[in-house]
Amino acid sequence: MGKIIGIDLGTTNSCIAIVEGTKTRVLENSEGDRTTPSIVAYTQDGEILVGQPAKRQSATNPKNTLFAIKRLIGRRFEDEEVQRDVDIMPYKIIAADNGDAWLEIKGQKIAPPQVSAEILKKMKKTAEDYLGESVTEAVITVPAYFNDTQRQATKDAGRIAGLEVKRIINEPTAAALAYGLDKEIGNRTIAVYDLGGGTFDISIIEIDDVDGEKTFEVLATNGDTHLGGEDFDSRLINYLVDEFKKDQGIDLRNDPLAMQRLKEAAEKAKIELSAAQQTDVNLPYITADSTGPKHMNLKITRAKLESLVEDLVNRTMDPLKVALTDASLSISDIKDVILVGGQTRMPLVQKKVTDFFCKEPRKDVNPDEAVAIGAAVQGGVLSGNVKDVLLLDVTPLSLGIETMGGVMTALIAKNTTIPTKHSQIFSTAEDNQSAVTIHVLQGERKRAMDNKSLGQFNLDGIAPAMRGIPQIEVTFDIDADGILHVSAKDNNSGREQKITIKASSGLSEEEIKKMVREAEANAESDRKFEELVQTRNQADNLMHSTRKQLAEYGNQLLQEDRNAIENAIQSLNTALKGESKTDIETNIQSLIQVSSKLLKLTQQQNQATNDNVKTDGNVVDAEFEEVKDKK
């Protein structure tokens, strides 16, 4: 079995790690960075840029540069969280034919899993470049509070990228693995506070260490899948826009280019204010009107930023209380607090967490890398390379069915350790009822329609009887991958119906296969483009060296030989302007052939120069004696 890589597919940044022997290693991407911006750009000439290259051009291509796509994955267009983003994102969010939230780029509809797949492809390539072998399997992390649809959409993204997703695990759980694997920590209960670019999670995790065998059991989890650093950025952006409007009378919200520059500046200022008390937002030529160009130059203090976002930080406090209650623990039971996600570097966040738990969070866990490391550890467990580790995760939301009166009746409560199985007896609501519809739901609301519908099926052939007499046994069975199997059995007749809930990501099997084919075609196109660039570079180097040799030694060649070389250089230069790798290679060989005499002449001259240096009579052998200064 090959390596199973660990990927933290983040809202703002993504990270990849592997297990080497007994150690984990975070891999650097092609730009030399340990994290990759989760940004994908579609350029005018059809190229797809991922990471820093996409981020660098975002100011000039805002409508075709996609970021924070994780906030849309697995969501419906009419969802309140999506509608909040529709008005503030520079790119176009649309409703797909099935009602899901999709993107529109240059008139083409794109599903969020397709965009995430581009990021995963870069992660996959990073691993393959380092390992020198093909990588086909991965463990990918998701927020603990992601529902089944969001998890399935993430798995689909992996599949489109050419990865078999061996396991989807929760980000706080992965961080706990990274924290606890190589530490002699004994038994303890920890809290993982994960505030990333777009999502927030809190997980209470118990680590049992018995004779070196560690069990990581999630006791409770809670969170908000639409709260993170992007929201902090938006608060600062809105403040800057309002201040500029007061000063200049111009609303920058109508200028996509200005807003993209402002987004970058706000993110930079937010990061700087984690270390400094004050920073400047200086954006010359941010816009212009009839009176001329306008510049933005504003001072932002840490106190001002904190006043803008304090309510967002406070929103993370209630889930902490709920998680502790669900775990039947008090604050004093928590031995360590782990901070995960870049937004936890903000001093205000650290202070609020410290005040809540009455203890300082640990500083020995890298908030940007811990999740990817934990995913790699889980990959090592699945491949058999990591021993003595058992991970017991939970289902984040309750699972149940719709019963009489439109009520959701839960069969499996939230925070139940998986895998798990639970059965319950139900009956008919009317006399002589011959069939029942089993409507499977996920969520915490009492009213069925307020929860997430996962699917439904019918059990018919029930023998006529007074209502309440038939016994219908409904069984929910969740496996280790979080896939739900539901069955309904009439205990009187023995008739049974089953359904496997592989939560739909909104993409049909045919759509996924089509996207996989497109991704494979793009991979071939990318490979050809890379080969073309390498051939062009080879041609450039050859022309440069040949011109240099011709300038130095061309007067020692016959005129016809010089003409042949110059003509070959000109032909190669013309071929470089085209897109044919074969044409460039043919002209490279032609230039090498006609310049063979020049090359031989150059080598002879270089050899003669080297010989002269060796026999230079002015070089004197001498012995030196070290002379020490007299003190």
Swiss-Prot record:
<dbReference type="InterPro" id="IPR013126">
    <property type="entry name" value="Hsp_70_fam"/>
</dbReference>
<dbReference type="InterPro" id="IPR029047">
    <property type="entry name" value="HSP70_peptide-bd_sf"/>
</dbReference>
<dbReference type="InterPro" id="IPR043129">
    <property type="entry name" value="ATPase_NBD"/>
</dbReference>
<keyword id="KW-0346">Stress response</keyword>
<dbReference type="GO" id="GO:0005524">
    <property type="term" value="F:ATP binding"/>
</dbReference>
<dbReference type="InterPro" id="IPR018181">
    <property type="entry name" value="Heat_shock_70_CS"/>
</dbReference>
<comment type="function">
    <text>Acts as a chaperone.</text>
</comment>
<keyword id="KW-0547">Nucleotide-binding</keyword>
<dbReference type="Pfam" id="PF00012">
    <property type="entry name" value="HSP70"/>
</dbReference>
<keyword id="KW-0597">Phosphoprotein</keyword>
<feature type="modified residue" description="Phosphothreonine; by autocatalysis">
    <location>
        <position position="199"/>
    </location>
</feature>
<keyword id="KW-0143">Chaperone</keyword>
<comment type="similarity">
    <text>Belongs to the heat shock protein 70 family.</text>
</comment>
<protein>
    <recommendedName>
        <fullName>Chaperone protein DnaK</fullName>
    </recommendedName>
</protein>
<dbReference type="GO" id="GO:0140662">
    <property type="term" value="F:ATP-dependent protein folding chaperone"/>
</dbReference>
<dbReference type="InterPro" id="IPR029048">
    <property type="entry name" value="HSP70_C_sf"/>
</dbReference>
<dbReference type="InterPro" id="IPR012725">
    <property type="entry name" value="Chaperone_DnaK"/>
</dbReference>
<keyword id="KW-0067">ATP-binding</keyword>
<dbReference type="GO" id="GO:0051082">
    <property type="term" value="F:unfolded protein binding"/>
</dbReference>
